[in-house]
Amino acid sequence: MKLQKIVSRLQELHPKEIDLSLDRIQSLCKKLGNPQDKIKAISIVGTNGKYSTIQAMFSILKEANFNCNIYTSPHIKSINERFVFNNEELNDEDLANLLEEVEEANNGEPITFFEILTAAYFLKASQYPDNINLIESGLFFRFDATNILKNNLASVVTSIGLDHLD
């Protein structure tokens, strides 16, 4: 119940105007100590097959004794699916506490729900500096909130549909 209340509050912060810049996510992450600069990531971009690609990479890395964190969007059953740390989904209580911490740092500023979730992911992922982060990126990466990573080890491009060629 606590998690649902926090999610509802965070969704109300959505800005009234569309702004495709990365200013909001950069500002929030700066308040959080720039956690995105402390993680090693592989970004997965494309129109189709991102989740399947992430799951295949996760299986390979896990078999090779790497610990992984995963950030995907959207979720199917529960928001927790988006947040995998040390090979395990984040439980409701830990996710609620994480989102509250990020909400407090944001201080009521307009921000998209995705940007809040992304900042929360970066903050938690920074607690696992040796893990490989498999991060699904949208908007063909350029204006996606995940595109503020400093230590992107690689980018994997899945199939590209015509809708992403404009």
Q: Predicted regions span which residues?
A:
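Charged, amphipathic alpha-helical linker segments immediately N-terminal to NTP-binding catalytic cores
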Residues: M1-K16
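General structural feature for long, well-ordered alpha-helical segments within catalytic domains
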Residues: I6, S21-R24, K40, T53, ...
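Non-catalytic interaction surface on structured domains
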Residues: S8-E12, K30-K40, A56-M57
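Residue-level signal for inorganic ion chemistry
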Residues: L10, T47, C68, L134, ...
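ATP-dependent carboxylate-amine ligase catalytic core
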Residues: K16, L22, Q26-D37, E63-K150, ...
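A conserved segment at the C-terminal end of the G1
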Residues: K40-I44, S52-N69
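Conserved beta-strand segments that form the floor/walls of ligand-binding pockets within enzyme
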Residues: S43, V84, V156
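Conserved beta-strand/loop subsegment of P-loop NTPase cores
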Residues: A154-G161
